[in-house]
């Protein structure tokens, strides 16, 4: 069992730094339990000590601003970003349970990885060459969507001269200006909502808009409008494959599905669905992708509502950079990157 003794002072912040050094992706703190970290998808104890109510009250006092503390007291939960040190940023969710404070914390490397370091498929990297339209990075929670998007934005920042505007909840990776001007807006503090930020973005002369999550009908509708009007829009959804992704978007609009099918057929440029699998050595994880790029045939299928036929076109679309997740996993197995 991984173990360490907590030091005096701000115990929880010290613990987070240690978890980061151990390669943890997440930390969970609950009064009455040992502090836990998620490594390679598995929950493990970080320390032998039991987290106390005093520990969590001290931790909350250390990380919450006056505004966040007011919100936390008002609604019992708050989501925000926190810079732990020069190497690690955190996406923190503090919440109340059983009359005590608990926390779920995502640890994020401050250094933004490149597309090459992540091993992203070339088709995904090539999304940066698009001039307009909608590109969706999808997958379950903790599948690396935010990291993939950060690498894509970083590639644009290094290679092109443009205005990039991001809408995030909260801001995870911070981008320093290179060739691009980058404005990163945080939902809650910089803008009221994703939808409000998107509507405002249309008046802020962006070339690229990144939306942290298409949460609702209003956000989806505005993202489609932005993509239609000449912007390149990157966004995420919690879907596992391309067919489900297209169906989810259409289902957002039960009252005018034909219009949405036509809009989506016109502006969708690509979908990359990802999930993380244990690598063959048991000491890390590898991303598996399903990739759909757009051809005239695929646009016609979406326009005509024949979404169920998309998968067969993806299976035979290798010359367009397409691949199903099943085929991608078989490829990883053949390369010895994951176990059969």
Where do the language-model regions lie?
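Short, flexible helix-loop junctions that flank or precede catalytic/ligand sites
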Residues: 2-340
């Amino acid at each position: 069992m991984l173990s360490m003794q907590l030091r005096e002072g701000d115990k929880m912040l010290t613990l987070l730094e240690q978890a980061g050094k151990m390669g943890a992706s997440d930390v969970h703190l609950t009064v009455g339990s040992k502090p836990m970290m998620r490594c390679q998808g598995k929950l493990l104890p970080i320390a032998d000590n039991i987290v106390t109510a005093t520990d969590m009250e001290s931790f909350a006092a250390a990380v919450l601003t006056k505004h966040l503390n007011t919100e936390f007291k008002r609604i019992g939960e708050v989501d925000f970003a926190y810079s732990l040190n020069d190497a690690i940023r955190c996406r923190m969710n503090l919440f109340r349970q059983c009359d005590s404070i608990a926390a779920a914390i995502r640890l994020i490397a401050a250094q933004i990885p490149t597309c090459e370091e992540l091993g992203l498929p070339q088709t995904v990297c090539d999304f940066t060459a698009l001039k307009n339209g909608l590109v969706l990075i999808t997958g379950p929670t903790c599948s690396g969507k935010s990291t993939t998007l950060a690498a894509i934005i970083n590639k644009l920042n290094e290679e092109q001269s443009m205005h990039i505007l991001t809408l995030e909840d909260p801001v995870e990776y911070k981008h320093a200006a290179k060739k691009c001007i980058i404005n990163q807006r945080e939902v809650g503090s910089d803008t009221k909502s994703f939808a409000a930020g998107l509507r405002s973005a249309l008046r802020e002369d962006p070339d690229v808009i990144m939306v942290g999550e298409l949460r609702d009908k209003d956000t989806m509708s505005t993202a489609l409008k932005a993509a239609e009007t000449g912007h390149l829009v990157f966004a995420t959804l919690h879907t596992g494959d391309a067919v489900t992704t297209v169906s989810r978007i259409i289902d957002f609009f039960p009252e005018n599905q034909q219009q949405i099918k036509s809009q989506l057929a016109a502006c969708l440029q690509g979908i990359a669905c990802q999930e993380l699998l244990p690598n063959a050595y048991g000491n890390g994880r590898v991303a598996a992708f399903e990739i759909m790029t757009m051809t005239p045939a695929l646009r016609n299928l979406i326009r005509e509502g024949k979404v169920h036929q998309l998968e067969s076109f993806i299976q035979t679309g290798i010359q367009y950079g397409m691949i199903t997740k099943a085929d991608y996993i078989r490829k990883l197995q053949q390369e010895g990157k994951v176990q059969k």
